[in-house]
Amino acid sequence: APQTVYEWTADVAVRFLKEWNFLLGIILLFITIILQFGYTSRSMFIYVVKMIILWLMWPLTIVLCIFNCVYALNNVYLGFSIVFTIVSIVMWIMYFVNSIRLFIRTGSWWSFNPETNNLMCIDVKGTVYVRPIIEDYHTLTATNVRGHLYMQGVKLGTGFSLSDLPAYVTVAKVSHLCTYKRAFLDKVDGVSGFAVYVKSKVGNYRLPSNKPSGVDTALLRI
């Protein structure tokens, strides 16, 4: 029996939108809210959902580009579809390469964050906290509010004091590591205050391991 050939026409597109318009609207509204309010300083859970959505964009784009290649309307569409497919695959590979390089430098799964390649690293009481930051800041601010420690507005934990803040904070990138030196510390009252860290050094380093090994904890060059 001959196979049925499906053609994507304007009437089919209109009928598809009529049937799926409500569901598509809800999905787009959900994605818009997540992208709008997904920040580490607001909700870590929403931010993780946002990262998952952004991460899924690449494979979805590649699948759609390949679909366009298979079902191209004409040679012009086919040519553009092939170019878009190649570009999407190359950019996705570059993302993985950069993420793996950053993971080698920091050892944190935040290295695979699709939004940024800047990872802020702070060692407090022997625990290294790694959090993503969007921009390359010249200064970083640590705030302690009655034992609640925030770094660039991102909450790290509770039960800390200003004396627990380290002398240095680092921001890891794919190609280098930025070191920030504590330049100012001020106590607002007995249990609250803030510290300002200023960028002082940039080099090709990796973070030292926080496991006890008897070696110097200085930054290790790679």
Swiss-Prot record:
Protein name: Membrane protein
Role of this protein: Component of the viral envelope that plays a central role in virus morphogenesis and assembly via its interactions with other viral proteins.
Ranges per topology, Intravirion: 41-43, 97-222
One term under GO cellular component: virion membrane
Subcellular location: Virion membrane; Host Golgi apparatus membrane
Transmembrane segments annotated in the record for this chain: 20-40, 44-64, 76-96
Entries under InterPro entries matching the protein: M_CoV (IPR002574), M_HCoV-like (IPR044362)
Assembly and oligomerization: Homomultimer. Interacts with envelope E protein in the budding compartment of the host cell, which is located between endoplasmic reticulum and the Golgi complex. Forms a complex with HE and S proteins. Interacts with nucleocapsid N protein. This interaction probably participates in RNA packaging into the virus.
Keywords linked to the UniProt accession: Glycoprotein, Host Golgi apparatus, Host membrane, Membrane, Transmembrane, Transmembrane helix, Viral envelope protein, Viral matrix protein, Virion
Primary location: virion
Post-translational modifications: O-linked glycans consist of Gal-GalNAc disaccharides which are modified with up to 2 sialic acid residues.
Glycosylation sites: 9
Membrane topology (Virion surface): 1-19, 65-75
GO molecular function: structural constituent of virion
Mode of membrane association: Multi-pass membrane protein
Gene it is expressed from: M
Biological source species: Rat coronavirus (strain NJ)
Similarity annotation: Belongs to the coronaviruses M protein family.
